[in-house]
Regions:
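Divalent metal-coordination and catalytic microenvironments
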Residues: 12, 26, 67, 88, ...
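A short secondary-structure junction signal
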Residues: 87-89, 95-100, 129-132, 148-151
């Protein structure tokens, strides 16, 4: 989403191939893919609500098949079996965000089955929160942070001795 969607996608695809970056589908990718459907209006109020996605689609039209194939989640198991799971929003939906004020009972449902580390990003607001035995991390956003800090935000996750270590980088 933004003026250089095609360039951004090219960069992360190149990093996927050269450095092993993992790519996931989020709600914006779904918006863009929906705009390419045969029943989408090209004018009127519905089009105007989705104009941003039509603009992005025009920039990434050569990568539509790649966007369709993106997985909804990624999991990495540590040497001792601790699971790191990454999704766009929650296990229920890529539009079901975890916020600082979300009650723990709700988070338990959003991350089930609970891994050692659950990584999300949909809300564009950085967050690290322990819920039972799970570290819940919202990595924020590189291009559109919603926490009044305009610096790019992303997460780094490394295996350290016997556990996952999480860091939000700004």
């Amino acid at each position: 989403r933004g003026p250089l969607s095609g360039d951004c996608l090219d960069l992360v695809v190149e990093r996927h191939h050269s450095q092993g970056w993992y790519l996931l589908r989020g709600n914006h990718e779904e918006f863009v893919l929906d705009c390419g459907g045969p029943d989408q209006p090209l004018s009127g109020p519905v089009f105007e609500m989705k104009r941003f996605a039509h603009f992005a689609l025009a920039q990434v039209v050569d990568h539509v098949d790649l966007l369709r194939r993106l997985p909804d989640e990624f999991e990495q198991e540590g040497p001792n079996g601790q699971l790191l799971r990454i999704v766009h929003a929650s296990m229920r939906s890529n539009r079901d965000g975890i916020y600082p004020m979300t009650p723990e009972e709700e988070i338990r449902r959003q991350i089930a089955p609970a891994p050692a580390v659950f990584v999300t990003g949909h809300t564009h607001r950085p967050l690290m929160r322990q819920v039972d035995d799970t570290l819940v991390v919202n990595i924020g956003s590189v291009g559109s942070p919603f926490d009044k800090d305009r610096r790019a935000g992303y997460g780094q996750f490394t295996w350290h001795r016997d556990h996952w270590q999480a860091e939000i980088v700004r």
